[in-house]
Amino acid sequence: MKKMFIAFAMFMSCSLMMWANGVVPTRFDERMDLMAVIWRMAGAREYNQCKISPYVNSVDSTFKPFASHKAIALAKRYMKKNGVGYDAVASMAAHLKLTDEGTLTIDEDIASDIDDRWSTAMQKEFVTALNDFYKMTEFHKWFVENEPIQKQCLDAFSEISSNIDLDWFAQTFDSGDANFNIILCPLAEMNNYGISTRHSDGTNVLSPVISCSKYDNGSISYESEEVLPIVIHEFCHAYCNPIIDKRWNSIAKKAEEAFRIKKRILSQQAYVTAKIMMYETLVRTSVIRYEQQHNSNTDVWQLIDKEEELGFILVADILKAWNQNLASNPGDILAESINNFSTEAYCAKVAEEEKRSVNYTCNITDGEKNVASGDFTFTITFDRQMELWSRHTWQAVPGKRW
């Protein structure tokens, strides 16, 4: 399998792909900020990690006086009883329509695919309270007053939004009807959501919510190497999730087996079902494939190993099958690659790895007292070579001994 990946990488380095740098429209969205503010006031951890202090100060000073408002009380109740948080908040924002008269309604032009944590009764109840909050707090006025900070974010993000190969999605997933745009939301910091909506005319609007900003001494920035793969990841959800849904019955058994093996680590990341794991697995595989096709220096095995550490143990097999069928849609190879995965062989490999040892020595005698100051040597010896990307803060040193 490794030879196959190396051969593919060599092919890519010999035929560098070029792509049109069409700028993806990027904006702040008043509906998203409105929902984020309410969930922040309701105490949602995922909406209380913004790093841009002027924005945070503006939010808190403006809206804390309304902490007892019904919209915030409902948000607290929905979080506790229905698990409405994270992407469910962004999903509601995407399905809202803000009229010229300043009224919020559920947009009837969008297919009713709002996150299923929102019941119809909850939607109706919440929108009524939301309208009152919007008017009472003069939310639109606050949103407009913060345009200078928004502009800083948009300017900082422009390098990323102009360097996305949109044609790749149509070519990879055999779909060309998508309308791409990006919503920046610093209030969602440390979380990003792959939101998409299908309109009555058939248009599929992909509008991922992206945070990932850095703030230092008044300067806002977005690191391209870190953020661009996240944007690709969130765009991929709009394509990958339906592929999994369509083929779920044919892969469910093996997916459930894989999920049981890694349930603990996956659940810690909020991937709490086998189907959610598979959404993420196919998306993460797609991002690696994008990296392969746009950067000849991509270390495929490093990316695969990192995904396996996070519990996504099917990535390598899907990517292998996909690379062996370069022209295929991932859905065409999905069932075969997953169903050929041996959970028994994987568990045996893990058990063997756990037997491997690490030894250490030091030139200080164990238990020695009154040790004089000076240079000491602490040697760690592994039973194999260390990887250059190993997660430590020391200088990477290949070999068995450090």
Residue spans for each PLM region:
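Bacterial Sec-dependent N-terminal signal peptides
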Residues: 1-23
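N-terminal mature-domain "stem" immediately C-terminal to a signal peptide or N-terminal signal-anchor/transmembrane
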Residues: 21-103, 310-319, 327, 331
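Active-site scaffold of zinc-dependent metalloenzymes
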Residues: 108-113, 193-225
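Auxiliary, metal-adjacent structural segments of Zn-dependent hydrolase domains
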Residues: 147-204
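Active-site recognition of the HExxH zinc-binding catalytic motif
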Residues: 225-246
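Post-HEXXH active-site segment of zinc metalloproteases
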Residues: 241-268
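Pan-zinc metallopeptidase signature
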Residues: 285-362, 387
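Short, surface-exposed alpha-helix to beta-strand junction/turn motifs within ectodomains of secreted
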Residues: 373-402
